[in-house]
Amino acid sequence: MSKHKRPFDQNLVNAINKLNWPLFNNEGIKVFLRHNSRYESAAEHISGKIHELKVRDIEILPAILKQPLFVKIDKRKGKLYFGKRRGVNKFPFLKIVVRVENDKTETIITVCSSKRCF
């Protein structure tokens, strides 16, 4: 087993499946992923929400960033990139778990990739 991989947490999967998406428009995110021509508004929505909520702990599997995250929108490729410094150390938009500290409670927000939802 590679050092970069770790067992998938089934409890996390179960928790995600029970979410009612209180902070993001779930359908809008799915539209963004399935139709690149409609991605811009959904991408801006995600970017604005992440900025507004002041994310404390970001987990991008298998990498973990415990600091504020910048979101870069690549309009030509129709993808979102998350990085430490305005596009530096970019991570492709594939499988992302965002933990947000909101009103002293931890909210787990997930984003679907074009192939699977996590």
Protein language model regions, located:
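Ribonuclease/tRNase effector modules and their secretory precursors
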Residues: M1-F118
